[in-house]
């Protein structure tokens, strides 16, 4: 086989393996509060970060906001700090700056701050109510 064809085959194989590895490995459900407002949050953990959604209980499940984030400190740190951006219909709505240590063997609960688009900051306290391996589904 010619070296050029071999390189292309290896590149495609590497891309396919990388794509498969990047699939969500674990899903989490949280219930708690942002300030005084009850919320339900779902997150899926990837190698490159997390995605999910959140809804305010008073608004109902049909009014979900999209979440996408990444850890912002060194993985060797015993406490992982996450920056999670919240959007609604593709528009920025706010940012979570929280501690969540599920991926380093720590607490699965989320605590920290949420700052909305107007600059108002709220305490975040979320308890993990469900953890599911998405690889097994």
Stretches with model-predicted labels:
Residues 25-137:
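Central antiparallel beta-sheet cores of small beta-barrel/beta-sandwich binding domains
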Residues 1-27:
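Bacterial Sec-dependent N-terminal signal peptides
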